[in-house]
Amino acid sequence: MKEIETLKEEYPLLNKLIATEEVFWVNPNMEKYETAIKDSPLSEENVKDAEERLKRFASYIAKVFPETKETKGIIESPLLKIPSMKQALEKNYEQPILGELLLKCDSHLPISGSIKARGGIYEVLKHAEQLALQHGMLTEEDDYSILDSDTCREFFATYSIAVGSTGNLGLSIGIMSAKLGFNVTVHMSADAKQWKKDLLRSKGVNVIEYEADYSKAVEEGRRQADADPSCYFVDDENSHDLFLGYAVAASRLQKQLEELKIVVDEEHPLFVYLPCGVGGGPGGVAFGLKLLYKDNVHCFFAEPTHSPCMLIGLMTGLHDKIAVQDIGIDNVTDADGLAVGRPSGFVGKTMEPFLSGNYTVSDEELYRLLKELADTENIYLEPSALAGMIGPVKVCKEDAYLQKQQLMEKVQKGTHIVWGTGGSMVPEDVMNGYYKTGEALTILEK
C-alpha cells in the first residue's frame, strides 16, 4: 500500500477524514448508467431471480411469521412523508431542502426490524431451498409452506450456518436460520449491543463474542465454517446473494412511489441516502434502484466519522486493501451497524461507477437527529439509522454535485428518500437512553 503521506497528498480530503471531521465527497468515477452496467458483474436477471425466489417462499414466511400475514409473506416496510422533520432540518441547519422528503422505514421491517431482514433472510432462504431441492424435499412448483414441518426442521438441523456481525445481520440470519431448524452461530464483534446478543440467544442461536472489531468476527466465522463441510458461511464482505436480497427493495419502492403519485424521471430526480457499514445493504439497494431509474436516481452512502471505510476505499481506489485503522482512525462509534473498518471490495468495485457520492456524520449529530425525528414525527430509529437523515441538507448545501449533474433547476421537483435502516426492535430502556443522549447534546449545542 502507498505510504500514508503520499495518499494524503493525492487525496487532500483524507486530512479531514483523519481528523474525524464531517466531509462530503462527490464520486469522480461515476459513469452514465449505460456505460456502468456493461461492466457490472451483476444484472437485472440476477435481481429478478432473487425476487422470484422470495415470492416462492412467501407462503412459508406468512405461515411461520404471523406478522407478515397481512402482506402475504412479503417482507416490506412503509415509505412515509416526513414534512415536520423536513421543517426541523431546514430550521436547525439553516438550509432549505429542495424537493420532498420521505423516510423508508426498514427500521420497521417484520421479523428482524432492520434492512438486514432483506439480504440476510434472502440468503438463508436460498441456501435452504438449494438443500431441500437437492435432497428431494421440495420442488420449485411446491407450496413452500411445507417446509414448516418437523421432518424439514430435523433435516436442516443436520446443517449449520455461521455469520460474523456487528448486530443486525446477525439478528436476521439467526432468527431465520433457527426458524428453519438450522444450527446457527453468530460471531459478534465488541461493538455489538448487548440486547441484540440476548435476543439471539433467546431464539436458540449460538452467539460467540469477540473483544476485537467486525473484521475479526467475520474472519473467525469464516474459519469455523471452513473446518466444517456441513456449515454454510454467510460472507457479509463478499456475498452476491446478500447483495441481491437487498436489491429486490428497489422494485418494491417503485410501487410505493407510484402509489404516492411521485414521479421519477429526468425532470423529477430521486435522491437516496443510505447508511453504510461494510457496504452490502446500501450497495444492493442502490444497485437495484439504478437498474430501475438509471441516471435519474442519485445514491449517496452515509458513514460515521470514526468508520468511513467505504469512502476511503472508493476515494483511494484501494477498496478492501485499506482499513480506517491504517490511517489512524479508531473505528469506534455508537452507530454499531456501521462500525466497520474495512469495506467490502466486491461492493466497492461493483458500485464505484454507479454511486453519486459519500459523506460522513458524527455520533453527536446522529443522536441529535434521533431526538429530532422522535419529536417531530414520533418515529424512533437506532443511531446508525439516522446517518442518511442529514444527506438532503448536505447535498443542497454543498451544491457541487447538483452543479456537476446540472440538477440545480430540477432538484425542487425531486424527491429525497432517507433509508431508515433499523430501530423497531431496540428495547424501550435502550431507546430512552439514546433519546436522552440526543436531548443532552441538543442543549449543549444551543
From Swiss-Prot:
Supply the CDD domains for this chain.
Answer: D-Ser-dehyd
One example of the protein's molecular function in GO is: pyridoxal phosphate binding
Q: Known catalysed reaction(s)?
A: D-serine = pyruvate + NH4(+)
SUPFAM superfamilies, per the entry:
Tryptophan synthase beta subunit-like PLP-dependent enzymes
- UniProt-listed InterPro entries: D_Ser_am_lyase (IPR011780), Ser/Thr_Dehydratase (IPR050147), Ser/Thr_deHydtase_PyrdxlP-BS (IPR000634), TrpB-like_PALP (IPR001926), TrpB-like_PALP_sf (IPR036052)
Per the UniProt record, which EC number(s) apply here? 4.3.1.18
Q: Which cofactor does it need?
A: pyridoxal 5'-phosphate
- Which positions bear N6-(pyridoxal phosphate)lysine? 116
Query: Which Pfam families does this entry report, sorted A to Z?
Result: PALP
Name the protein family: Belongs to the serine/threonine dehydratase family. DsdA subfamily.
In Swiss-Prot or TrEMBL terms, this protein is called Probable D-serine dehydratase
Species classification: Bacteria, Bacillati, Bacillota, Bacilli, Bacillales
